[in-house]
C-alpha cells in the first residue's frame, strides 16, 4: 500500500531534480527561483551561468532601484539594491563591484546577483581613485 504524503512542499524535492530544472533557466528566472527557499538558493547558485558579455548598470539619482541592461538582447531588468545606498562604483570586474560609501568612505566589494558583500579594512590614506586586480579563475 502506498503511503500518502501529507502537505508536500517544493522544498522537499530532490536537489538533483532542482539542479536539472535550474540549469535550464535563464539567469533572471534562476535568480527568481533561488528566492523560494534556502535549498533552492544553494542549488540555483551552484548551477547559475552568468552571461559572458557585460551588462550595463544604471544608477538611480534617488532611491535604490537600479536598472541592469543586457546590451546583446537589449532587455532591461530592475533590481532594488538598498545595500548600495549612497555608494559610488569605483571599479567592476567579473560581476563584482568595488564600491565606496560617500558618507563614511568605507570600501567594499558587492556582487549584485548574489548580493554578497565583502567589507574591506579601513584605509587611512586619502585617495581619489581605486581599482583591483583579480585573475579570472575557471
Curated annotation (Swiss-Prot):
InterPro entries: F-box-like_dom_sf (IPR036047), F-box_dom (IPR001810), KIB1-4_b-propeller (IPR005174). Residues 7-53 form the F-box domain. Transmembrane segments: none annotated. Pfam families: Beta-prop_KIB1-4, F-box. PANTHER family: OS09G0392200 PROTEIN, REGULATION PROTEIN, PUTATIVE-RELATED. This is F-box protein At4g12382.
